[in-house]
């Protein structure tokens, strides 16, 4: 069949030719093409550039964040319409890439951007592209200069809700005149408990509450431990609510620590080991074993009678926060190398033949030590001695000198050594009467309260240890010679003045550093040093500025002004600080962690940990302190510690 051809005429274009087939249902014609724009030869072509558009619309509202000097933050929305993308500044003060107001593109090189949103960005964004990311706004620079002065925990008030709410009442005794329900409620409110019981279930010691009050709970603990022991799967610890239970089994004794202070199992277990060492220092290991071999149900409270104060003072030091226990190291009194060497020489020249160890201690800090060439005292043994001398107060109240049989478990847990202790206080000792008279000037005696509060720091003790129980008079004679020689050379007054200086300030060590407190441990010497913490004054007195710093460390200024308010605040700040250090230490020393540097930021503080084979360093700063500034301050403190190493630490000591 022949096809038919139609020719149509159009006014807008050339004629169209259409072929038609004899199909019974012809398809509709396609739509006409749009008219083509005529290009004038007088003007160049205006072609819009191809611009990428977002594939997902998140929000059409701009959210701005502002940081206040007290560390708090606020957010608000801006309703101004946006024309394309505009450069803006995020909460950390750094500009983020975008298009300009004219809608132009960024440079071709700006193809990747990394931004990690956090609750508290601190401006540590790593730019992968152009340097425009690191540009700070002028308003942020002005605000940052004020916010960086915020001290750790400054925004937390005493009694504020939180994990440490009520900690200021932690060491209050449970009253005996209340009903059992009230006493039990007070006991349960304590944040830290230590229990010691025998494998037969006999209670031995409890830090809070008498044994009659907690006897039933000890029975429950003994049942749980015995159940797991019977299954040949000793129980190491468990969690109940927000409390962590850690159990240590030492022969016939069970040690239990219950903590709500966010401490790791390893840290709690080291504290329980220290309590066990305290018991061994009284009984020795063979005596302890023989007691329970013959009578497993023996009540150990009678052999340990009189040592409850030592256990309680040691436990309270753990609850308050003990850097020495956390780091497993000693703190020494800062002295010049020549001065310490001269004191060691006086020691060695007047040494008795029956002397094993000789120590001079001031305010709980080691000043000088002489020892045999191949023997040294373990820090845990020295911690027991310092706890006995300076924390419990039993020896100091007994008079000017004491003779004490003592087992040092890390040195030898199977026998006793004999310790001669004498305090140099100037009043009870005629050898120091001239010195005390010279020092009792009107300026030093105007404030008796200050003198009483600093008595612990001024206490200087001479400790002479011998394996011979008949060497009392020999060591007493050595003490008299040392007293006369140290007084004559002026070394005793030198030690006392050094003890009164207390710990160094950050601004003295590294002026301008943005860290508030640090711990530095020399791993080779097993010794540490620390600084004083200076937050803003929480309760400024009339006529003083609210930003005037006040020392939180143990100082006469703090202790003599409003002790009813500052003492709980100081104790709470110390606990918060030590909680941060416990968390850092646990993270750095976690099994299989292998961390070298750790930076952590919370709502109240920023912290940094750094561990090398030479040292361990931990520091705390305000919540707005940048990481780079903290690292710079840490470097300066570490360099200072290396320069002052022979003053801060005892290297070798006197050896005979």
Swiss-Prot record:
Residues 443-453 have a biased composition (Low complexity). It is a peripheral membrane protein. Residues 1-105, 433-455 are annotated as: Disordered. GO terms for cellular component: fungal-type vacuole membrane; Mon1-Ccz1 complex; multivesicular body membrane. Coiled coil: none annotated. Signal peptide: none annotated. Residues 53-67 have a biased composition (Polar residues). This is Vacuolar fusion protein MON1. It comes from Chaetomium globosum (strain ATCC 6205 / CBS 148.51 / DSM 1962 / NBRC 6347 / NRRL 1970) (Soil fungus).
């Amino acid at each position: 069949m022949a096809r038919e051809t139609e020719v149509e005429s159009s006014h807008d274009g050339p004629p169209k030719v259409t072929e038609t087939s004899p199909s019974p249902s012809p398809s509709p014609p396609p739509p006409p093409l749009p008219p083509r724009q005529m290009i004038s030869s007088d003007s160049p072509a205006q072609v819009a550039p191809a611009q990428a558009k977002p594939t997902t619309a998140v929000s059409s509202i701009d959210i701005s964040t502002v940081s206040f000097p007290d560390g708090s933050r606020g957010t608000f929305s801006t309703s101004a319409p946006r024309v394309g993308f505009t450069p803006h500044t995020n909460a950390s003060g750094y500009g983020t890439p975008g298009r300009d107001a004219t809608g132009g593109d960024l440079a071709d090189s700006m193809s990747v951007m990394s931004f990690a949103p956090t609750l508290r960005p601190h401006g540590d964004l790593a730019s992968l592209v152009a340097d425009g990311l690191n540009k700070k706004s002028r308003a942020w620079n002005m605000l940052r200069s004020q916010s960086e002065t915020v001290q750790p925990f400054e925004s937390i008030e005493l009694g504020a809700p939180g994990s440490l709410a009520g900690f200021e009442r932690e060491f209050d005794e449970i009253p005996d005149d209340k009903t059992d329900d009230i006493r039990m409620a007070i006991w349960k409110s304590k944040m830290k408990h230590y229990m010691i019981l025998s494998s037969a279930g006999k209670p031995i010691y409890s830090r809070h509450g008498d044994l009659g009050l907690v006897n039933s709970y000890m029975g429950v603990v003994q049942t749980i431990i015995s159940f797991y022991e019977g299954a040949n799967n000793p129980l190491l610890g468990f969690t109940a609510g927000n409390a962590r239970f850690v159990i240590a089994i030492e022969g016939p004794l069970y040690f239990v620590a219950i903590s709500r202070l966010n401490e790791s199992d390893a840290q709690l277990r080291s504290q329980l080991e220290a309590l066990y060492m305290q018991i061994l220092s009284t009984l020795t290991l063979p005596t302890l074993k023989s007691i329970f071999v013959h009578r497993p149900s023996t009540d150990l409270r009678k052999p340990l009678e009189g040592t409850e104060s030592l256990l309680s003072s040691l436990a309270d030091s753990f609850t308050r926060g003990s850097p020495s226990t956390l780091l497993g190291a000693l703190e020494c009194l800062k002295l010049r190398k020549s001065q310490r060497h001269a004191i060691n020489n006086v020691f060695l020249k007047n040494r008795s033949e029956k002397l094993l160890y000789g120590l001079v201690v001031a305010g709980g800090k080691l000043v000088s030590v002489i020892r045999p060439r191949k023997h040294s005292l373990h820090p845990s043994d020295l911690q027991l001695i310092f706890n006995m001398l300076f924390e419990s107060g039993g020896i100091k109240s007994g008079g000017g000198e004491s003779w004490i049989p003592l087992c040092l478990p890390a040195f030898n847990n199977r026998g006793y050594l004999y310790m001669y202790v004498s305090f140099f206080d100037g009043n009870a000792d005629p050898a120091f009467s001239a010195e005390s008279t010279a020092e009792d000037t009107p300026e030093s005696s105007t404030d008796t309260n200050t003198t009483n509060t600093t008595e612990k720091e001024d206490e200087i003790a001479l400790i002479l240890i011998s394996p011979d129980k008949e060497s009392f008079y020999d060591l007493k004679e050595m003490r008299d010679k040392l007293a006369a020689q140290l007084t004559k050379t002026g070394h005793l007054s030198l030690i006392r003045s050094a003890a009164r200086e207390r710990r160094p300030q950050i601004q003295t060590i590294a002026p301008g550093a943005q860290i508030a407190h640090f711990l530095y441990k020399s791993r080779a010497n097993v010794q540490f040093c620390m600084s004083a913490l200076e937050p803003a004054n929480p309760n400024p007195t009339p006529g003083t500025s609210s930003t005037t710093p006040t020392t939180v460390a143990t100082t006469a200024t703090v202790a003599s002004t409003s002790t009813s308010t500052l003492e709980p605040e100081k104790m709470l700040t110390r606990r918060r600080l030590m909680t941060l250090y416990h968390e850092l230490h646990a993270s750095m020393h976690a099994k299989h962690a292998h961390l070298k540097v750790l930076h952590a930021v919370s709502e109240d503080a920023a912290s940094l940990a750094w561990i090398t084979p030479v040292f361990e360093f931990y520091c705390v700063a305000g919540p707005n302190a940048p990481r780079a500034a903290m690292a710079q301050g840490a470097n300066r403190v570490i360099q200072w510690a290396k320069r002052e190493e022979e003053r801060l630490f005892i290297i070798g000591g006197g050896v005979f």
